[in-house]
């Protein structure tokens, strides 16, 4: 199920963590948080204006509406911002890809997908492509 999409521009200082528990989720149990997986092609640099730097890992986050500032590392000219409502006990993946936009131009698209726990644990580009096809039907 497609949750939401894009917009642009920001720089951030580097903060790293393997598994990041977003501050508003620190006192919540596993069943009370949403799990956001960050694909290897995306760097999450901000959640609700709080600076982070997470790439290819997962974030345990309090449920609710969140705004993310993200960046595709290999594409310096495109930064993105998106928002999504995350629910407790559910799994999401933040991913990106490009589409032709005419001539030499292309558009960078960021999306948050809800996935099953199994798909989350085995997440890869093949799973994303299947989700994109399903979201268009």
List the predicted regions and their residue ranges.
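Short loop/turn and low-complexity linker motifs enriched in small/turn-promoting residues
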Residues: 12-137
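Bacterial N-terminal signal peptides
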Residues: 1-7
């Amino acid at each position: 199920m497609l949750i939401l999409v894009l917009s642009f521009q920001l720089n951030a200082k580097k903060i790293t963590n393997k598994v990041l528990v977003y501050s508003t989720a620190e006192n919540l149990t596993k069943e009370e948080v949403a799990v956001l997986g960050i694909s290897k092609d995306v760097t999450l640099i901000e959640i609700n204006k709080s600076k982070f730097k997470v790439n290819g890992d997962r974030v345990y986050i309090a449920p609710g509406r969140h705004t993310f500032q993200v960046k595709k590392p290999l594409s310096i000219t495109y930064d993105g911002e998106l928002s999504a409502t995350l629910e407790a006990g559910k799994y999401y993946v933040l991913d990106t890809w490009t589409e032709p936009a005419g001539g030499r131009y292309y558009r960078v698209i960021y999306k948050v997908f809800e996935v099953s726990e199994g798909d989350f644990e085995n997440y890869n580009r093949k799973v994303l492509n299947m989700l994109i096809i399903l979201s268009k039907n």
